[in-house]
């Protein structure tokens, strides 16, 4: 997948805490660093985000986007 955003961090999902509407996703990007993002629970399910799965955090000026290769 190619994106125009330059700030992309590959990592592994450490945890996903799902709520009714929003979910907290923690991504380990190495070097002792983690990125935490709130995304919709429907997006977390669609991306199949769960502990140990690879994902990419895309940082934009106003938001953080989490992506995976497994969109349905």
Regions found by a protein language model. Give the residues of each.
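Non-catalytic connector elements of ABC transporters
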Residues: 1-72
